[in-house]
From Swiss-Prot:
One of its GO terms (molecular function) is structural constituent of ribosome. GO terms for cellular component: ribonucleoprotein complex; ribosome. PROSITE patterns: RIBOSOMAL_S11 (PS00054). Residues 113-132 are annotated as: Disordered. PANTHER family: 40S RIBOSOMAL PROTEIN S14/30S RIBOSOMAL PROTEIN S11. HAMAP family: Ribosomal_uS11 (MF_01310). The keyword Ribosomal protein applies. The gene is rps11. This is Small ribosomal subunit protein uS11. Belongs to the universal ribosomal protein uS11 family. The keyword Ribonucleoprotein applies. Located on the platform of the 30S subunit.
Amino acid sequence: MADQPQFKWAIAHIFSSFNNTIITVTDLTGAETLAKTSGGMVVKQDRNESSPYAAMQMAMNVAEQIKAKGIQGVHIRVRAPGGNHQRSPGPGAQAAIRSLARAGLRIGRIEDVTPIPHDGTRAPGGKRGRRV
């Protein structure tokens, strides 16, 4: 019996805030980084680093790099700043996922790994909250 060619998977870690988007692709263990890019590598203005356009360009660059290394599919882990900060991902997250799929990569699972505090440090605004 002939051996079936092994389907190679990786994990795409997408960190998306309202200031930047960072995409890092690692092997399944997370030990080896295969490709890495951030908003500042594809756009000139700081204010555009978190934009969906920048995320699309980043995802295309990353997809090219990992396809060259023989990766055919990715599991996606989306992360927002979390903790005492914003718990919803920025505008670049969805564009990055869509762009990875459009680049011809198989999408496995998509999970949200935003850190959630279990009563950690005091939230900004102090004891009485933000008074407007």
